[in-house]
Swiss-Prot record:
The keyword rRNA-binding applies. This is Small ribosomal subunit protein uS13. Residues 94-117 are annotated as: Disordered. GO terms for cellular component: cytosol; small ribosomal subunit. NCBIfam families: uS13_bact. GO terms for biological process: translation. Belongs to the universal ribosomal protein uS13 family. Located at the top of the head of the 30S subunit, it contacts several helices of the 16S rRNA. In the 70S ribosome it contacts the 23S rRNA (bridge B1a) and protein L5 of the 50S subunit (bridge B1b), connecting the 2 subunits; these bridges are implicated in subunit movement. Contacts the tRNAs in the A and P-sites.
Length: 117
């Protein structure tokens, strides 16, 4: 198994799909990395040399991925909550942030119904 950015990349998948298992790397960025390094996107991860793997690691190190990205997202949400702005209040109350209706929908975000006693 190839290990990139602390994640085990599945060896039976194509390199473009395997790179997407890293948090912060989607389809566009995975294809961009393949083009930059002149790798064929449909090459299986198992067929990539150690040299190419090291080049991929160096390229991915340029981006904010995995733990750093998760931490940044958590800090952004915490900042909104601390500011007390509309989005922060909605985060605190576990309600939708972007104007969706909540009278009949948003059950996933609001959680299970609470019984009134």
């Amino acid at each position: 198994m190839a290990r990139i950015a602390g994640i085990n990349i599945p060896t039976h998948k194509h390199i473009v799909i395997g790179l997407q298992s890293i948090f912060g790397i989607g389809d566009t960025r995975a294809r961009e990395i393949c083009i930059t390094l002149k790798l064929d996107p449909v090459t299986k991860v198992a067929n990539i040399t150690e040299n190419q793997l090291e080049l991929i690691r160096v390229e991915i190190a340029k981006y904010e991925v995995e733990g750093d990205l998760r931490r940044q997202l958590a800090m952004d949400i915490k900042r909104l909550k601390d500011l007390g702005c509309y989005r922060g209040v909605r985060h605190r109350k576990s309600l939708p942030l972007r104007g969706q209706r909540t009278k009949t929908n948003a059950r996933t975000r609001k959680g299970p119904r609470r019984l009134i006693k």
